[in-house]
Amino acid sequence: MRRRLPRRFSIRTAAVAGGLVLTATLAATASATASATASAAPEPPPPPSRAAAAQGAERTHEVEYFTRPGGHPRHTEVPAATPERLARADRPLSAPEAAADGDVNAVIQTGPVADKLDVVVIGDGYTAAQQDDFHADVRSKWAQMSAVEPYASYKELFNVWSVDAVSNQSGVSGDPGKDVVKDTALKSYFWCDDIERLLCVDTDKVESYAAKAPDADLVVVLSNSTKYGGAGYTLTSQIGYDGIATASSDHPDSDQVAVHETGHSLGKLADEYFYDEYGTYTGAEPDESNASKLSAAQLTAQKKKWYRWIGQTSPDGGTVGAYEGGRYYPKGINRPTDNSIMRTLGREFNLPGREAMIAGFYRYASALGSTTGTDTALKRDAAIKITLPASATVKWSVDGTEVTDARGKKSVTPASLGIAADGRSHTVTATATDNTTAVKDPALRKLLTDSRTWKVTA
């Protein structure tokens, strides 16, 4: 069973106008070395926010946004609170509406929350009569995301939950025009910080609904709109989830932005695009696994970062090497391939990126899932059932000795493993290992093995 990551809190926020963003805090703790690195090479500051400047000391979030499909993002800051013009008095929900508000549904449940990466999707701008539409939108959006590698190969690691947030009006504020104001449960609105495509939300309201789900590692707000836009928040809430995303429910590009943004949250990957005005990077070696000051020859000689992949053909096209430009700088930083999804929407993850994503999945989920509890002793005829990713195998052992005939089986009984009715206590252990060739780093491969032990009373 994978141990849950420790809860932590960050007010840093990233947003993207253009679709889902599933981003997360990049580290629970920082070493003294990392702190020194951060001091030596601070991130470029975002430009001043128009809204933040106008509203003084109001709490703000740093954001990243896309102004159009396929464009590279820009950075700014936005107010954390819903603008006053949108914070008008809400009509109370009727009794039937209130009864439906906050309902939780399992869209996809592959196993217990302790074993899985749990994604919670909350609807906004859907009336009580439109909740079935919301559920259909959740299924559609997740199908698009999970068709992309490495998601497609690891669907068994995810649970997806929907939480119904009943709105008084259909649609969201700012759609189609800036003057449109809608009475919705989560206060989603376009024109955040006067940027048309930036789709912001009341994060406190989001947290109140997310708390209704069995568990939440990532949270998505699906806003009832066809308009191009979205926002994502890189934070960890006080109830434990990493990241909030907003997205237009019916825009075709939102899933691609989601995949890009989870590269940050789950894969801890840097952006691979750059801006000419940033000049030359002169700071310390970046922390992210897909950005380096080193050349391909230096990476190989020093056995650093993606050196194991250099020279191999990558699914995003071309060969893994060291391509100049990345992490916003055109000079002084190299990226693994010319044009992965961390640079351009619609592309694939490159080989180092896929490795990082798979490792990110396993930081939340386990290679071995089971609904058979380990708290109480089992009888000889009790069924032990497990779940595995497609690329994983399992070995079974009794009292520390492997039962080779049971290799690969996903359902066994202690009796079928050879435990006799001898009146003694025994243990049954399942050990699962993901044998994917997409993860080469030995340190990351340690995340790909998990085991579970049951006591048996014969």
Where do the language-model regions lie?
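Secretory targeting and sorting signals
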Residues: M1-A41
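Zymogen propeptides/activation segments of proteases
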Residues: R2-R7, S39-A147, K385-L388, A392-V398, ...
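Active-site-proximal segment of zinc-dependent metalloprotease catalytic domains
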Residues: A99-D118, I122-T127, A143-Y278
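Short, solvent-exposed loop/turn elements at domain surfaces
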Residues: A128-D132, G229-G230, F349-G353
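Short, solvent-exposed linear motifs at loop/edge-of-secondary-structure regions
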Residues: Q131-P150, K331-E348
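Stable alpha-helical elements in mature extracytoplasmic
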Residues: F134-K141, Y154, S254, A258, ...
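Short, flexible loop/turn segments at beta-strand junctions in immunoglobulin-like
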Residues: S416-A421
